[in-house]
């Protein structure tokens, strides 16, 4: 593995992209352990800054990300996970976390009701 440059708190930003459509699905953070777990298992793992723990995408929702390839940027301080997305990527129920324009117009497709999956609304 290349020598990654982790930012403050030992985290690196991860952009998640659909490996077929190239659609950007989400952005999250990973620590070194989460990156290694992702690399070794082929399932996307991230680090939750609010819960202060590693989490596997889909462990609660069933909407998993199978990682086909991990790309590293030129400065070695940002990653792209190219994934096969099962269901929605966003905890709000949308396929992608980027489902709104800057002026607030919803352009994305809602896949599930977060209240039914998590017992709470997405926001």
Swiss-Prot record:
Co-factor requirement: Mg(2+); Zn(2+)
Cofactor note: Binds 1 Mg(2+) ion per subunit.
Coiled-coil zones: none
One function term, GO molecular function aspect: phosphoribosyl-AMP cyclohydrolase activity
GO CC term, one of those recorded: cytoplasm
Keyword terms of this UniProt record: Amino-acid biosynthesis, Cytoplasm, Histidine biosynthesis, Hydrolase, Magnesium, Metal-binding, Zinc
Matches recorded under SUPFAM superfamilies: HisI-like (SSF141734)
Catalytic activity entry: 1-(5-phospho-beta-D-ribosyl)-5'-AMP + H2O = 1-(5-phospho-beta-D-ribosyl)-5-[(5-phospho-beta-D-ribosylamino)methylideneamino]imidazole-4-carboxamide
A Gene Ontology BP annotation from the UniProt entry: L-histidine biosynthetic process
Pfam family of the protein (one): PRA-CH
PANTHER family, sorted: HISTIDINE BIOSYNTHESIS BIFUNCTIONAL PROTEIN, HISTIDINE BIOSYNTHESIS BIFUNCTIONAL PROTEIN HIS7
Function of the protein: Catalyzes the hydrolysis of the adenine ring of phosphoribosyl-AMP.
Family: Belongs to the PRA-CH family.
Subunit structure comment from the entry: Homodimer.
NCBIfam families given in the database record: PRK00051.1
Name of the protein this chain belongs to: Phosphoribosyl-AMP cyclohydrolase
Organism for this UniProt entry: Methanoregula boonei (strain DSM 21154 / JCM 14090 / 6A8)
